[in-house]
């Protein structure tokens, strides 16, 4: 039933919503009223979203003069002002600066906590890991993994990853039994089991003193690492999709 779907569902498309002739505040308020919100409550909610997403500077700026990031945040707020039982967000963080991306993820989490089912599509795996309850990883349209972030990370073969910035022109060999993955000319990583972290750090510290690498960082395996291993995408490709 298309009419029922429209009542129960809010959608933020990947392409920005054309709101030429309106301001962000007016557009958010107008959509809230079209969704059945009471005028006074809708206006208050629109103003709350403007403040929560740090859009006050552009609240009354004509849409044709705002940036792509502000337009993206406005489109999200138009979905969130009077949310339905299902909220669908397609790449909601595209074009959004790092500071406001954090604010946006907070608002997405609040939508879910308030009772809406939130279905979101994103390549920003590292940020999504902190906000989602469950996820499905797709590769060329096929489901290759699904579950909670913790379960997917726990199912990974290694517990830690050693990120390395290589010195140009220098060759490095990881400790025996550890495999090095080259991401680009300067960056590589080594998967490390929990019982070999000391050995991995000692090896990296020696390589740093020897000038073979410029820096290193040992961190727990992230959902992004799982995504890269499952899909075969490089970390740089993941970051490029998320930019």
PLM segments and residue spans:
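Conserved ABC ATPase "signature" region
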Residues: 29, 33, 41-58
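Hydrophobic anchor residue at the start of the ABC signature
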Residues: 76
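Conserved ABC ATPase signature
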Residues: 62-66
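ABC transporter nucleotide-binding domain
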Residues: 107-193
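Helix N-cap at the start of a conserved alpha-helix in ABC-type nucleotide-binding domains
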Residues: 98-100
